[in-house]
Amino acid sequence: MLLILNGPNLNRLGLREPGVYGSQTLEDLERQCEAWGAELEMSVTCRQSNYEGQLLEWVQDAEEQGFTGLVINPGALTHYSYALRDAIAGQRLPVVEVHISNVDAREEFRHQSVTAAVCRGKISGLGFSGYRLAMEYLAEVLE
């Protein structure tokens, strides 16, 4: 059972910087993740919040809620949220960080991730396909 978390501003997909993030919406992404989950024979729950504390609680509670893996796009929290980093580090579940855009090809401040080091891996710049790759990886390691 996978938990897919999307952080701040990802509710604005399709509206915010379509040249960077594309024209598809968060709802489109969630539908795709659910379809990919069905192909992988894994149930998927998608959640989004603009609030750091809510994301922290979802990460902290994931295992006791029965989730076996976590895909997270922390949004801008990637670059400065040590609280989110610590929540991920304290989680026993495998976690993969995903970014729709290539953060290393963007502004300098986006090049640093404080969360990636405590994740199993980081996928960046592959659009929505990055979520699928993260899900495939988790399906493989959770077999």
Swiss-Prot record:
GO molecular function per UniProt: 3-dehydroquinate dehydratase activity
CDD domains: DHQase_II
Gene3D superfamilies: Dehydroquinase, class II (3.40.50.9100)
Keywords, in A-Z order: Amino-acid biosynthesis, Aromatic amino acid biosynthesis, Lyase
Keyword Amino-acid biosynthesis listed: yes
SUPFAM superfamilies: Type II 3-dehydroquinate dehydratase
Binding residues for substrate: N73, H79, D86, I100, S101, R110
NCBIfam families per UniProt: aroQ, PRK05395.1-2, PRK05395.1-3, PRK05395.1-4
PANTHER family listed in its UniProt record: CATABOLIC 3-DEHYDROQUINASE
Subunit structure, as described in the record: Homododecamer.
Name of the protein described by the UniProt record: 3-dehydroquinate dehydratase
Organism field: Deinococcus radiodurans (strain ATCC 13939 / DSM 20539 / JCM 16871 / CCUG 27074 / LMG 4051 / NBRC 15346 / NCIMB 9279 / VKM B-1422 / R1)
Species classification: Bacteria, Thermotogati, Deinococcota, Deinococci, Deinococcales
